[in-house]
Amino acid sequence: MNIKYILPALALATTSAWAQQKELSSGIDKANMDLTANPGVDFYQYATGGWTAAHPLTPEYARYAQFDALAENNRKQLRELIEEMAAKQHKQGSLEQKIGSLYHLAMDSVRRNKEDYAPIKALLEEVQALDSRKAVQYEMAKLQSMGIPNFFSFGCDADLKNAKWNLMQVYQGGISMGERDYYLENDEPTKKIREAYRQYVKNLFTMTGMNAEEATQAMEAVLKIETRIATASYSATKQRDVEGNYHKMSYQKLLTDFPGIDWSTLFLLNGVPAFNEISVSQPEPIHEVEKILAECSVEELKAYLYYKVVNDASSSLSDRFRQEAFYFYNHTMSGAEQDRPRWKRAVAAVEGALGMAVGKLYVEKYFPESSKQRMVELVKNLQVALGERIDAQKWMSEATKKQAHDKLNSFYVKIGYPDEWMDYSKLDIDENLSYYENMVRATQFMSNYYVEKHVNKPVDRTEWLMTPQTINAYYNPTTNEICFPAGILQPPFFNAEADDACNYGAIGVVIGHEMTHGFDDQGAQFDKDGNLKNWWTEKDKTEFEKRTKVMRDFFDNIKVLPDLHANGQLTLGENTADHGGLNIAYQALQNAMKLHPLDKKDGFTPEQRFFLSYGLIWANNTREAMLRQLVKTDPHSPARWRVNGALPHIDAWYKAFNITSKAPLFIPKKNRVEVW
């Protein structure tokens, strides 16, 4: 339900109704812990050691975490719902038919192996027949309309400085390894990945009929183009600079400043109506694309587009293509040893194409209304606690505090599922067509849906950016909203059978984390209405940056592996949100216990259970290759350091576990982060 909650001035909602109805558990299972570990030496091991020992990595996983354990259960529930649809005949065009037919197609590997790459053969021949730069530009626009990314990407989202309206936007893209560092860095692990990528690209060319010499030449063209784009692209850290990634201009100025790209054909083929303004988020890589289109030979440009078609289609073709892509992207880059079973891939495909339709079925069967009601109260409690935390900041002026309260009071809260569901009537799934062709249809449907909903339209705050079955949560700065899908509202994050100490330490911190994103180094740049607009006094802004620098420097000094440090700037927003989430949720727990005190349970005080619950949600096992990939690309710190790096900055943690100055995790109070 989409409800806008205004923070009450004095009222404090509690979860007492549930507590009064029955005795709730501690929520702590000692089997998940390693009681031989010292919490002051390695709290992560202490809180999660039993769980990690009981969940060794299987060949399918490069990382297995609490999120994945919960996802496995969700996936089984979704499989049951989807296979129920697939087992019956339904009227063509009905939602049940679309779900069932797409699942049939995804499961039919015999048919796909027989077809091999026939579903894309005509498209590849079309690319090979291109004979001019103009034809290349037309083809790149056409491929974009099919959901095949190339050179750069574009979309239509909220205008950062006029957040009530959507704005056309162009973004860097076009590099198939995703992160520029894979093309540019020369440490041994990165060089090995780059060499494997060269082989992967070459293999895709030989698998579609080229001889070895032709494939090598085409591969070199792809690497040449992608390396040029990567060199001009913004790093993951630079992309976090909100102001530095906003370059709004008129459509006419786009044509003038970037004349080397056929924009009119691009937007025409993608069904984008005429518009007046656009933001080129990262101008430098777009200028580099102009140069590439002008300087590279037509044969090189064709090789790049040809590869993009095959690479994008690989997971929807025969097993030999799927396995080739798995070996590079999942094994070489991430460390997974075995692909997911076919039914899991099929469920993921249906979710990807018909996510909200599946979500509606999921909510109806598995999400109790009582969970939403309890979440409403928890969110209110966290809002009160954040308000108190804002008031307690001695470094912040009253003027800035007032602006912060205004923003907090304007939070738009979404819990469970949307009020209105997506209309899939314009999506046609036809089992007479190949699996690949149907997946292209699904992509085109989503593209058309968002063009119709966004271009030249005001922002719809009721729109959900995640499906209800998603095990995650988010804060969106341009709508100033926090969203908690039904998928995350279950153990270990939310436990209706456990008391407040457990729930505030888990889902409470998640709620506080998302709220804090409204006040982290990025979110703090947006006002209560979602506009990129300064609301800080100069003195307060300087002090805020000084305090977040402590966080950045602390994580920069963490050694994730002997030859690999964490990236404090890339992870600054998430680390700040973890810090704020812990402080806010702990404050909310203390408020709740003033009215309804909690006793020691299973040998742990409420405060200890709070921190143990937090630690457990980050339990995971991760392969080294995946860990290296995450440090390059993920704005979140590795799970161990979301515990061992975050908790030593929380004063209450020391008291709860009697952590002394002799403990390795101890940080002197003057060196601890104190932001929210």
State the predicted function of each range:
Residues Q21-A31:
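Short, Gly/Pro- and small/polar-rich lid/capping loops
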Residues A71, V222, D257-G260, S279-P283, ...:
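Intrinsically disordered, low-complexity linker/terminal regions across diverse proteins
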Residues N32-A53, Y183, D187-T206, E398, ...:
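Hydrophobic/aromatic-rich, well-ordered segments within soluble, folded domains that form packed cores
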Residues L12, E60-I82, E213-A232, N503-V509, ...:
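Short secondary-structure subsegments characteristic of cysteine-rich extracellular domains
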Residues M1-K22:
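Bacterial Sec-dependent N-terminal signal peptides
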Residues K30, A54-T58, F154-G155, E179-D181, ...:
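Short, solvent-exposed loop/turn and secondary-structure capping segments
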Residues M85-E377, N381:
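Noncatalytic, helix-rich "gating/capping" subdomain that lines the substrate-entry/channel surface
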Residues A37-V41, Y46-M107:
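Active-site-surrounding "flap" and adjacent substrate/cofactor-binding loops of secreted or lumenal enzymes
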